[in-house]
Amino acid sequence: LVGSEMCIRDRFMICEVIDMNIISTEKAPGAIGPYSQGYTVGGLVFTSGQIPVDPATGAVAEGIAAQADQSCRNVGAILEAAGVGFDKVVKTTCFLADIADFAAFNEVYAKYFTSKPARSCVAVKDLPKGVLCEIEAVAEA
């Protein structure tokens, strides 16, 4: 969708066209703000944070295990739309509404992210729509 030109200045000016493409899929919930579901740029895939909204119904399941599962499936749908899988993920950032859910969240997360990418997991005060978790990922394209 967007082509950008990156220039590196040193003794010489080197310009390289970097393809930047928006990722969009109906298999993951649409953005609830002014952002895209994901982007590919420079050989990487970046997903926006995925909350546990069922893309078909808009429903949010109850409990951390069900919500973690849906968030992982939403991330997977965006990765799939970019032509990659969970095995290409190199970094995730996970947000929990309650750090007490850490163990239960990890149990579900580990079933999807079997290659054990680098990860940050933090508890936050609030998440959109009152959900219990959110996951964003960076993958090799």
What residue spans do the PLM features occupy?
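Acidic, Ala/Val/Gly-enriched low-complexity intrinsically disordered segments
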Residues: 2, 16-19
